[in-house]
Structure formats: C-alpha cells, structure tokens
C-alpha cells in the first residue's frame, strides 16, 4: 500500500510539472513586424501595421497588413489585406489573398478587390463620404526568405 502511494504521488508530481511547464513554451500566434504612420495627403493619414499571423513549416507564411485611416485626426475606417506566401530561399510567390474593411464616422468602405501577382498580394477599395472618395491601396511582397515589405 505504501509503495502504491509513492508511485501515485510521483505520477501526480510528473503530470503537474509538465502541465505547469507547457505555458512557458507557448508562443503568440501573431508577431508584429512593423508599425508606422503614412501621410496620404489632403489631411488623410494611415497607421499601418504588418503582422506575421501564421507560419506553416519552413516554406510558407501568412501576413496581414492593416491600415487605420484618419481624416484631420478623426478615425474614418480600416482596411486589412491578408496574404499567404510560399518561399524556398531562391524564389517566392503569393499563393492567396483576402481582405476586409469598414468605414466609420460617416465614411463607407466598398469596391474591394484582392489579387496576387508573382511575389506580391494586393487590395484595392474606396472610402467614401458624400462626394469625397479616397482610394485604398495595400500591397505586401515577400522575398525568397519569407520576409515581407
């Protein structure tokens, strides 16, 4: 009976050690690559963030590029391009693209299209308010080592 308790205690301690150690090795699934502000002219600016959202082995990655738009300091909308790239150290290619967007504070978002060409992915759309239209254009390119710009 005493031996059974020792074995059970050792099993419980081992399970607890592994259960407590797992969170230490957990990684965030999203990594911010860069954030910067772009002046688009006519009082419009965009806060741009590029994130690595998924790593699929050593030869494919998914990135997103989001742009939050402001007119005179007032938030007017957001657009996001998400793209998947494959690469092998010699070449790269964009294998898929999707997008989303929203208008805010009287602005509407529409006319969105996404596509890929070679090693790049693209999003095109329009933010509109009355007779004012702002062209939204986002692109992501990947080099042969899986780095984006």
Question: Model-derived features: where do they sit?
Answer:
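N-terminal prepro-regions of secreted/extracellular proteins
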Residues: 1-73
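Mature secreted bioactive peptide module from preproproteins
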Residues: 48-149
């Amino acid at each position: 009976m005493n031996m059974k308790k020792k074995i059970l205690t050792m099993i419980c301690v081992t399970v607890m050690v592994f259960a407590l150690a797992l969170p230490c090795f957990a990684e965030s699934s999203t990594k911010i690559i860069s954030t910067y502000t772009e002046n688009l002219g006519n009082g419009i600016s965009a806060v741009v963030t590029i994130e690595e959202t998924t790593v699929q082995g050593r030869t494919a990655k998914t990135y997103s590029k989001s742009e939050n738009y402001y007119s005179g300091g007032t938030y007017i909308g957001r657009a996001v391009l998400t793209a998947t790239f494959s690469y092998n150290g010699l070449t790269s290619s964009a294998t898929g693209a999707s997008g989303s967007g929203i208008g805010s504070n009287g602005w509407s978002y529409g006319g969105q299209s996404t596509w890929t060409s070679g090693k790049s992915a693209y999003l095109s759309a329009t933010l509109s308010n009355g007779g004012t239209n702002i062209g939204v254009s986002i692109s992501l390119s990947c080099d042969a080592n899986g780095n984006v710009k």
